[in-house]
Regions:
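Periplasmic/extracellular loop-to-transmembrane helix junction in inner-membrane transport proteins
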Residues: 2-20, 37-79, 246-255
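Interhelical loop and adjacent transmembrane-helix boundary motif
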Residues: 56-59, 63, 215-265
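Transmembrane-helix boundary motif in ABC transporter permease subunits
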Residues: 79-111, 124, 275-284
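Transmembrane alpha-helical segments of polytopic membrane transport and secretion proteins
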Residues: 1-25, 275-288
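C-terminal transmembrane helix and the adjacent membrane-cytosol boundary/short C-terminal tail
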Residues: 94, 160, 164, 202, ...
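Amphipathic cytosolic juxtamembrane alpha-helices at the membrane-cytosol interface
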Residues: 14, 86, 99-103, 167-199
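Generic hydrophobic transmembrane alpha-helix motif, especially the helices
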Residues: 112-148
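Transmembrane alpha-helices
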Residues: 159, 181-219
Length: 288
């Protein structure tokens, strides 16, 4: 009799927890869907070729985000150009070369700590060091260097964890064939962890696109088209996320702000999709 009561109580408890989890999952999906649909509904009607292909004109009272798109592309490329080699090389050293495990643990802890620091602190430090101490002033290159520091832990840790998934037998097989340490890393280990590098790169791009606070301190918020690449990097410029803040907060241009928000929302969805498909592709290729 007691066993029957316990069994009924356990089934009731299981059903209740299952229902609770379903409600939580449905609520999460509903909130995400509402946010995405609301932003798209508010922003897509205001998207136009004129908005995407012109610069803002205060005399004509028109909004254009072409300078912001160019600044965003330059910011992403400049950041990745520096942070990818640094992060991958640091991960390779910590995983394949470093013999002092205590030092590795300290560096890993420091990287995880850096990942949790608010971005506005990075912006303040970047302004003091890059803009003032190094004399870069507010510029895209100063913002990119600040984002390098912000995203370095992400690239390093994702690459490091991916390196650890490469079986030790692969390394031993390469050594047995007479390959040296660096040749083994270059031809066997790194190709085996390319999914981690790509995933870290995609995550970094997502963070760069969404960053605002740090760039307000270091890159500024100018909406200006410049002649050459060097002039663009050495001048102040607003990325799309910074432009969204400026239009919504400073100028009250909510139509332009929602249009930019819709663009960023689509980019975020595409980045998440790319990360998911990349992970599935390399997982399937490893299983072959």
């Amino acid at each position: 009799m007691d066993d029957m009561k316990f069994s009924r109580r356990r089934r009731a408890w299981g059903a209740m927890m299952r229902t609770l989890m379903m409600v939580c999952a449905a609520l999460t999906c509903a909130l995400a869907a509402f946010l995405i649909l609301y932003v798209l509904a508010k922003g897509v009607p205001h998207l136009s070729w004129q908005l995407l292909s012109t610069k803002p004109s205060y005399l004509d009272d028109t909004i254009g985000i072409l300078p912001d798109i160019i600044s965003t592309v330059c910011m992403v490329l400049a950041t990745l150009l520096v942070v990818l080699p640094l992060g991958v090389c640091a991960a390779v050293y910590l995983t394949e070369y470093a013999a002092n495990k205590k030092m590795v643990a300290v560096i890993e802890y420091a990287a995880e700590t850096l990942s949790g620091i608010p971005s506005i602190i990075y912006g303040l430090v970047g302004q003091m060091f890059f803009c003032q101490f190094l004399g870069m002033k507010k510029s895209l290159i100063a913002g990119a260097m600040t984002l390098v520091i912000m995203n370095l832990p992400t690239i390093m840790r994702t690459t490091q964890e991916s390196l650890k998934t490469v079986p030790q037998s692969y390394r031993e097989g390469a050594f047995g064939l007479g390959a040296g340490k660096w040749r083994t890393i270059r031809t066997v280990v790194l190709p085996g962890c390319v999914d981690g590098v790509i995933t870290g790169c995609i995550l970094a791009v997502g963070r760069i696109l969404g960053e605002t606070a740090a760039l307000l301190y270091t890159a500024g918020f100018a909406h200006t088209l410049y002649g050459g690449l060097r002039e663009t990097l050495e001048s102040s410029g607003a990325t799309l996320s910074v432009a969204l803040y400026v239009y919504a907060k400073e100028q009250g241009e909510f139509e332009g702000a929602f249009a930019i928000a819709a663009i960023l929302m689509v980019l975020a969805l595409l980045i998440d999709l790319a990360a998911t498909l990349t992970g599935r592709y390399f997982k399937k290729r490893r299983s072959l």
